[in-house]
Amino acid sequence: MIPPQEASARRREIEDKLKQEEETLSFIRDSLEKSDQLTRNMVSILSSFESRLMKLENSIIPVHKQTENLQRLQENVEKTLSCLDHVISYYHVASDTEKIIREGPTGRLEEYLGSMAKIQKAVEYFQDNSPDSPELNKVKLLFERGKESLESEFRSLMTRHSKVVSPVLLLDLISADDELEVQEDVVLEHLPESVLRDVVRISRWLVEYGRNQDFMNVYYQIRSSQLDRSIKGLKEHFRKSSSSSGVPYSPAIPNKRKDTPTKKPIKRPGTIRKAQNLLKQYSQHGLDGKKGGSNLIPLEGRDDMLDVETDAYIHCVSAFVKLAQSEYRLLMEIIPEHHQKKTFDSLIQDALDGLMLEGENIVSAARKAIIRHDFSTVLTVFPILRHLKQTKPEFDQVLQGTAASTKNKLPGLITSMETIGAKALEDFADNIKNDPDKEYNMPKDGTVHELTSNAILFLQQLLDFQETAGAMLASQVLGDTYNIPLDPRETSSSATSYSSEFSKRLLSTYICKVLGNLQLNLLSKSKVYEDPALSAIFLHNNYNYILKSLEKSELIQLVAVTQKTAERSYREHIEQQIQTYQRSWLKVTDYIAEKNLPVFQPGVKLRDKERQMIKERFKGFNDGLEELCKIQKVWAIPDTEQRDKIRQAQKDIVKETYGAFLHRYGSVPFTKNPEKYIKYRVEQVGDMIDRLFDTSA
């Protein structure tokens, strides 16, 4: 049971809460009424706004649509006016551009091309929209005139600014490849930069709009002429320079002229010039410039000319490669890609044909020289052939994409030169063997025969062209001729590819064949001499000359490839001839040789028969000595070392024999006039022998 006080308190608390809740409820009711009122007010406002908006829309939309229609009409009018202006402009193109077209593109190419573009568009418009319009014919004619003017401008620019490359610049360009030190690259500027831009611009327009390829023919004709003239100018430069100074150019000349190359001259082949120098060197070494030398030195005038022509041709070949490379770079900028190869092929034909024709002329001249047995002239083929082979990779690269007939020209020339070179080598060997001249040009003093000097000289030239000469022989499959087995490794790659070792062996065998033929011929020629001693001197001189020449020119190393004992064999031949010569003195020394002398008892008076025998011995010795000295004085042993050796050996023998004879019989009273028989002292005999082989004594 809750106490009354607590229940009363609880009731008051509940009443307070109820009162509080009633107040809250009253507040909520008031708030709801206010909210409803606000909602009604808002709905009323929105309804009013919507009504007004609808009224506004109903009044604005018609105005907007009307404005839009007006704007569309305005745009259509503007477009129509623009189209009319555009169409009308085509009718004015002819009059607007006629003056520019008439005056031509010179000096204002871009403006001219702009006018041509307008004319082109006018032509297209009238063709599409009014093909019967007289305006079409007018703009067509104007376009054709404009195109012709552009073609004329192209020709004019190419003609005016295409210059022949000077020989000096060409020589610098060629020598640049051989320079070891770093130098500025030699650049060929065929056309000035501004002109090149115009030419390129015109060519592109003609290809794109002109639909005309005639300008390509104009291009290759003009450039072909300049290329050909540049090469001919270089050749003429060599001829003029050689006629004025003896050589095409010389860096040793202190005062450089304007036609002097700025770089070092490249190494000249100088085949004939080198031949002359070698011949002089060996003739001086072997002949002391006295006997037998005069008929061995070739005519320098003709050989100088051959030398210049050879050098000129080699330089022209190199110049062609450099110019062709430069021409192709220029052509790539001007000519459309799909026409470049064909145009380039046409461009180089004249210059290439000229080089090939000159090469064939060289082959023809060599063929005639072989018939005349003028083998020194044939030597010009060797440096040219070597250079052509060295240049062939560049040639092939330059001629990529050209016609097969163009590509085959150089290989054809190389084959012709190899064939004629191989024939020259074979004919030379046969000529050495079968040389018919015996008495006609035999040296009366027994000195070196011209055939020997010429043969050695020819072989010496092959040292500089070992690979070329070996390839000549190998290309003609001459291995069987020299009985050299072919190594499968040397022939497996291709029929014309031979190793350098095989070529060296082949050339060595060829040289040995020539030397063998020469030796046989010399033996035959030596029989012309009636005196065996002079025959021996002749063979000695020739064998010694051959050996010394082989040693000095390093031919001996090449010979030793297939003939290891060649040097020893020649020394034995030389010694044999010395011994043969020494036997000629037996008819002198036999008179006073101890084995042929009678024995006299000392102190016993000589009988008349004995005195007469001693007189005959002295007289026979004196007469024989005088006769031999007189005869052999005019003989020649050009090699100083050999001459002194032979003199000394003979002097020792004769002095010893004569000294012993004189010692035995000089004091014997075999005559009342001893000075009549004892004409010479031992020293005098030695002096007489010292004067052998010396025409100046």
Swiss-Prot record:
The protein's role, per its UniProt record: Component of the exocyst complex involved in the docking of exocytic vesicles with fusion sites on the plasma membrane. In adipocytes, plays a crucial role in targeting SLC2A4 vesicle to the plasma membrane in response to insulin, perhaps directing the vesicle to the precise site of fusion. It is required for neuron survival and plays an essential role in cortical development.
List of residues that carry Phosphoserine: 133
GO MF annotation terms: phosphatidylinositol-4,5-bisphosphate binding; protein-macromolecule adaptor activity
Provenance organism: Mus musculus (Mouse)
Keywords, alphabetical: Cell membrane, Coiled coil, Cytoplasm, Exocytosis, Membrane, Phosphoprotein, Protein transport, Transport
Coiled coil: 5-42, 63-85
The protein's name in its UniProt record: Exocyst complex component 7
Domain notes: The C-terminus is required for translocation to the plasma membrane.
Region (SEC8 and ARHQ binding): 1-384
Lipid bilayer topology: Peripheral membrane protein
InterPro entries according to UniProt: Cullin_repeat-like_dom_sf, Exo70, Exo70_C
Subunit structure comment from the entry: The exocyst complex is composed of EXOC1, EXOC2, EXOC3, EXOC4, EXOC5, EXOC6, EXOC7 and EXOC8. Interacts with RAB11FIP3. Interacts with ARHQ in a GTP-dependent manner.
UniProt keyword Lipoprotein, yes or no: no
GO BP annotations listed: membrane fission; mitotic cytokinesis; positive regulation of mitotic cytokinetic process; protein transmembrane transport; regulation of entry of bacterium into host cell; vesicle docking involved in exocytosis; vesicle tethering involved in exocytosis
Pfam families: Exo70_C (PF03081), Exo70_N (PF20669)
Region (Disordered) location: 238-270
Main location: cytoplasm
Similarity comment: Belongs to the EXO70 family.
